[in-house]
Amino acid sequence: ATATGGRVDANRLPFQSFDLGKDNRSITVDVRNRRFNCDLQQYSCAPADSTSGGMAAPENSSVSPDGRTAVYIKNYNLYAKDLTTGRETQLTTDGVKDYGYATDNAGWTHSDRPIVTWSPDSRQIATYQQDERGVRDMYLVRAKAGNPELEAWKYPLPGDSVIFRISRVIIKLNPGGAPAIVRFQMPPDQHRSTVSDHIACAGGICDVEWYPDGSHLAFVSSSRDHKSAWFRVADANTGAVRTLFEERMPTQVGDASLRENLWRVLPASNELIWWSQRANWLHLYLYDLTTGQLKNQITTGDGNVDDIVRVDEKARQIYVMRSGAEVPGKDPYFQQLYRVGFDGRGLTLLTPENANHQVTASPNGQYFVDAYSTPDTPPVTVLRDANGKVLQTLERADLSRLVAGGWHPPTPFHVKARDGKTDIYGLMFTPSKLDSTRKYPIVNYIYPGPQSGSVGTRSFSPARGDNQALAELGFVVVAIDGMGTPGRSKSFEDFYYGHMGDNTLPDQVAGMRELAQRYKFIDIDRAGIWGHSGGGFASADAMFRFPDFFKVGWSESGNHDNRVYEDDWGERYQGLLVRSDGTDNYAAEANQTYAKNLKGKLMLVHGLMDDNVPPYNTTLVADALIKAGKDFDLLMIPFARHGYGQDTNYAMRRRWDYFVKNLLGAEPPKEYQVGKPGIVP
């Protein structure tokens, strides 16, 4: 409370997770969009951009692992500040506008914080010089009294001849001496990664890992269309680069749901643990770190490796989270901890509970903290030894107050996909006072991916957006992960690759129809759909492609035409703009192509200052609807970005009103005030 200047209730802490300091005497937490370091001995907190030396790090800086140095961008160059003495050192000198170092100032997400990855000894940083020269601008217009303001930034689109390129470098800080720049001896890389549609991951660069001694940097280069990825190692002293092997897929290499590297370099044994979906599942493989030759496959069979929890080099064992396999009575999305040898032998399940497990290893690897739960059962947190034996139950979540207040969990279900064979999974939200003799309209909350799905976490969550709130107004609300979303096999994940207009919609319709047969209180003749971003694309798409099934749609901030969205997204999941035969690869997937099919009630919503999905996506759909003579509703939020910020609750209330009036057939209360968003007690 002292650090934030606000009131904090000990029973409702304003954070859900924390990072334990290396000394085990402090934690780092994120509160109200700020990060704080908290001393567990003194019970005091301070902003994380200040250090134990008492000297504040510059705003938007990256602090070294030892906490002594901060690196930041100034005038397109990198500077370092010694947080003990306050001395500032200019690390680079040739950075200029549109060709700066470590910049994150362009594309669909941008900030002023440098993208760097520190070496373990805090003496070097891996980064790049980003070439934005010649990249086209995107524009937004901010309204104000008098002349409006033009906002412009670099934002390439699919098919552009010039897109971002990065020249990789290592910068040696050389405290007490002159800094040195080591440029990689290779052409500039594409602005691509295997684990994101960006190159920033967890505060650093995606797809890079330092050798423990800082002598080399391992990294992955991806092709523009994501069909190829090359594993490479750079000498940190000379910049010489070795390419060990190429990973290639007919669709796209990578799994953007991972959001972090799923490979490890092991210089002590001259080996690499690599991941691949070449066998239709995400498995681990052991490679020779010198020759790039495959030694053996580590994990096999049905199921994915979702995370590497720990690598025990001495025992030659890996602890991994796995999911994806079809086991009767088990949700295939549940992640569980396994141990397996480098040679692929001895695969052992260590967390047998039929639930989704979130596991953290102790620094010495002798213990694991395991929090497991399901969408409808509360978390249990236990302490396990390295063999999975439960040593102590640390905590059991108590839901009694939630239940006393009328709360009830969603209902997990599985139904058949469009093919009538494949199981797909979802959650159903019903009114707390459900009358099974009544008929309730059904609303589908959709996010089609491809990098995630509608359901979200398979762990317990007391609230999932406003799904339950909408259900309380008299609806059945469902979220279904259709074919073309991650967490299953590669063929499942890539099901609609190259056909983004699919949006899992045939699976949504099939699943909703099956649920209506199973639960007689569902009125399948009154079906609605809504979503945001990719879900906005999908919900409008649903109204155009399934006009006789969906009666009401609410489409927020949709990337309705991926020719008007950032280059990396479409080129990863749809392919390049122009096919090999010279024809357009995107027009058939754009929503305005099918707007003439609208029959039901549709609301289009977009923030006019959306710098992720430009509002012109919605403008094109609106224009097509007007040209087709269709009635529709339009809500443009003047100052909202991709998220609606202070206008979030207004948009949510309007959405509730829209479904109540047009799908439920009732009159909502006029201008109901939901409350102010973002207030943390």
List where the protein language model places each region.
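Beta-propeller folds
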Residues: 1-379, 383-384, 400-404, 424, ...
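Serine-hydrolase catalytic core recognition
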Residues: 136-137, 183, 205-207, 214, ...
